[in-house]
UniProtKB/Swiss-Prot annotation:
Protein name as it appears in the record: Rubredoxin in uptake hydrogenase operon
Entry's Gene Ontology molecular function annotations: electron transfer activity; iron ion binding
Function: Could be an electron transport intermediate in hydrogen oxidation.
UniProt-listed Gene3D superfamilies: 2.20.28.10
Organism this protein belongs to: Azotobacter chroococcum mcd 1
Domain of life according to the entry: Bacteria
Keywords: Electron transport, Iron, Metal-binding, Transport
GO biological process per UniProt: alkane catabolic process
Length: 72
């Protein structure tokens, strides 16, 4: 049994829409694919599912599994 939190997408990024905005449950940083990630040099238009495996929250260094889908 895994003790890792798998966000509201249950750790399966294939379940996410390409335009889904996700939020870190630790620090509330939002990853918006329309914006990308300047810290990790991720281009705008990059869906969460396409982020590199080593990508982590640019604000708190949390695992990508700590991100939850934003419903607003």
């Amino acid at each position: 049994m895994s003790t890792r939190f798998e966000g509201s997408y249950l750790g399966n990024a294939a379940r996410l829409a390409d335009d889904a905005v996700l939020e870190c449950k630790i620090c509330w940083h939002r990853y918006d694919p329309a914006v990308g990630d300047e810290v990790w040099q991720i281009l705008a238009g990059t869906p969460f599912a396409a982020l590199p495996a080593h990508w982590r929250c640019p604000q708190c260094d949390g695992d990508r599994e700590q991100f939850m889908v934003v419903d607003d």
